[in-house]
Amino acid sequence: MYRLRRPIDFLPLFQDQKRLFTAGERFHYNNAGYILLGLVIEQLTKQPFADYVTNELFARAQMTQSGYFRLDSLPADTAIGHIENEDGTWRTNHYALPIIGGSDGGAFLTASDMERFWRSLLTHQLLSESMTAQLFHPHVKVNDVASYGYGVWLKQLDASHEKWHIMGYDPGVSFHSAYYPQSETIVTVLSNTSDGAYALVQAIEQLLLEKGIHT
């Protein structure tokens, strides 16, 4: 596990596996695609993926508390991920994750930094206006209410409200961050448990809809 430090280190986990279907036939989210994307970025920029994201995303968006930190070199105020055991006790997730995140996820960040990310992205400080539009374009329909853009989930909440969101989880950590374009509202929930973020996001979203904050 601790030998997984660069995108190339993840290749043996999937490179010899049989494809699920022909490319373009249907949609199936998979982390392996983001590992390959990280390798492309490294090839084009001649930089380690984590360094490129730090310089071109975190720094430009002024996400000063975020980074690809090693599990054995975390900032002092980092919330440690926890996994619940079958008997109801808890253990840390230090032996359940790679030593450092990869191009499929694993960065450390704060809710305030995620707001800076959304604002920077939506004001075209990170990408051009046309590229940003492609990011949020529904390139594939997932079900009756959800589509997928370029790395972003697009969900229709009701006839007049939608949200653009990113999410993820690993052992001992869960994350959900959404932008509601009708009101320009941002909601970010981070949890140091595997499923702690989802229920809270649902509750906040329901409250927003009931109170009419989106309108």
Name each region found by the language model.
Residues 159-161, 194-215:
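Short, gly/Ser/Thr-rich active-site loops of penicillin-recognizing serine hydrolases
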